[in-house]
Amino acid sequence: MGKDEILSESAGTPSGAADGGRGLSARDLITTGVFTALFLVFMMVGGALFAPNPVLTFWMPAAAALLTGPVYLLLIARVPRHGPLVILGAVVGAILFATGMYWGWAAASVVLGAVADVVAGLGRFRAKPLNLLAFIIYSLSPMGSYLMLWADPGGYAAYLTGRGTEQAYMDTMARTATAWMLPAMVLAAVVCALISGLVGLRLLRRQFERAGMTA
């Protein structure tokens, strides 16, 4: 048995799971659902630290990225095939939209979830650098909301106040959104996603080493 086959089995999936030869099984869907729920929990915990404050909310994408890397990468390891990352992105997007978040974030979650699936698939979901890149790409999905504060501040504020956000909150956000804030947000999200992803890869490596082989 080759190393890739052992790696796949140690991750709890059939040895041929990453070859795209079959669709998602019931077990795969259950695993995807569990990890999607965990991802949402960690994302909300990260968001809860900053999102309620109109000055600190700009650092929410970085905080969410810092907490979700291990979950995202473990999902790829457990179900190394096309589909789970798309499902995660779609479910997260649907929940964001249903809970009153700006529609651009929901749309970005769906689109970047699909992009992440393609990127990880280039390495058959076993190439660590590509899996890490997939997570970093998806971690930028909150920017689909915040970007509109610069692109269309009036429309952005009108949409969110129409869905329950206080006008005072939006006014403070607008005053805080200086020219340097947008690139700083992107950089912080990328750096935090990189750190979180590396932690996730290290945790996976330790799991593989306990199983008697190296990742």
Q: How does the language model describe each region?
A:
Residues G2, A17-I87:
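Hydrophobic transmembrane alpha-helices
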Residues G2-V34, L38-V41, M173-A215:
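Alpha-helical transmembrane segments and their cytosolic interface
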Residues L29-G33, A62-L66, G83-A90, W103-A107, ...:
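Hydrophobic alpha-helical transmembrane segments
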Residues T36-M44, V91-T99, I137-Y146:
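Aromatic-anchored segments of alpha-helical transmembrane domains
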Residues V41, S109-Y146, G197:
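Short helix-perturbing small/polar motifs within transmembrane alpha-helices
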Residues G46-F50, P54, V79, G83, ...:
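Membrane-interfacial segments
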Residues A48-P52, L56, V92-A120:
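Interfacial aromatic-anchored transmembrane helix boundaries in multi-pass membrane proteins
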Residues T57, L132-R206:
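Membrane-embedded alpha-helical hairpins and interfacial helices in multi-pass inner-membrane proteins
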